[in-house]
Regions:
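Iron-sulfur-cluster electron-transfer modules
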Residues: 3, 9-164
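Cysteine-cluster motifs in flexible loop/terminal segments that predominantly coordinate metals
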Residues: 1-3, 36-39, 226-230, 234
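Cofactor-cradling patches in redox/metallo enzymes
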Residues: 46, 100-168, 191-260
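Conserved beta-strand elements of the Class I
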Residues: 94, 184-185, 256
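Ser/Thr/Gly-rich flexible loops in soluble cytosolic domains mediating phosphotransfer, phosphorylation
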Residues: 166-182
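Alpha-helical transmembrane segments of multi-pass integral membrane proteins
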Residues: 187-189
Length: 260
């Protein structure tokens, strides 16, 4: 039962009420959840399951070894992977690229923003939200002074909600794109979808480029893909199984490209 929401809620309740002592098994049980909120869509009692689990994590005194590593990397490098950050430009607007976008994408992103004709400063460091998901507090980066702030990663948008963040799909959805006629299957990420309610803009862009294919379970009912980095590092086998499930359906539907 500990693999299911009810079991994790019971563990959280017992820990918070002193009925259960914290040990590494308890830590592992409470961290073995991506906070994707998919279970909340099926919950008839409307229990805020992700909020309860995440809140309980802040009470934990111990970290999983994989989580300790990303915590150390963030505080040393401002990057959970321990990689070197970069910045580009000095515009009045900012594009918070974050740590999850591949560095090879930098030139593509710069080219797109240059074509729009607006000045952007590109920031590549981690927003830190993965640490909040595992129950760690830290001082938030100051992004005051920018007129607009774009994000490619929904984690960053959630971390900086007070700045009225704009997702790149929202920013580019009104632009024209060259069609390639390929079949694109779109996967709704849990944080862009269930947390931020951004569903249509990515689909609008895909329809301009090629053919949109939907997963059987989509939008607020979309399954999690196993890609949240803090979960994937700690539970790689489970994350891989989730990814295989998504990949299997994409293959069955003859998708050329899986995008999210």
């Amino acid at each position: 039962e500990i693999d299911f929401p009810k079991g994790k809620i019971m563990i959280a309740y017992g820990l918070l009420n002193g009925e259960i002592k914290e040990d590494m098994d308890v830590v592992k049980i409470l961290q073995d959840c991506s906070l994707c909120k998919r279970c909340e869509e099926d919950c008839p009692s409307n229990i805020k399951i992700a909020e309860i689990i995440n809140g309980t994590r802040y009470k934990l005194k111990n970290l999983l070894p994989e989580h300790k590593k990303i915590y150390e990397n963030f505080h040393k490098y401002k990057n959970i992977f321990g990689e070197e950050n970069f910045s580009y430009g000095n515009g009045k607007n900012a594009f918070f690229m974050g740590c999850l976008v591949k560095k090879e994408m930098k030139d593509v992103i710069i080219s797109l923003l240059d074509k729009i004709g607006e000045d952007f400063k590109i920031i590549s460091e981690c927003c830190g939200y993965p640490l909040r998901k595992i129950g760690i507090n830290f001082k938030k980066k100051n992004l005051d002074g920018y007129e607009k702030i774009l994000f490619s990663c929904p984690n960053g948008m959630i971390e900086f909600m007070k700045h009225s963040p704009i997702h790149i799909s929202q920013f580019f959805s009104k632009c024209d794109f060259k069609r390639d006629g390929k079949n694109y299957i779109y996967h709704d990420s849990e944080f862009l979808g269930r947390y931020l309610k951004i569903y249509e803009e990515p689909r609008e862009i895909i329809k301009k480029i090629g053919n949109l294919i939907e997963f059987k379970e989509n939008r607020k009912m979309a399954r999690w893909c196993g890609g949240e980095i803090e979960y994937k590092l700690a539970f790689p086998e489970k994350a891989e199984e989730l990814a295989k499930y998504i990949a299997k359906e994409a293959k069955e539907k003859n998708a050329t490209i899986v995008t999210s």
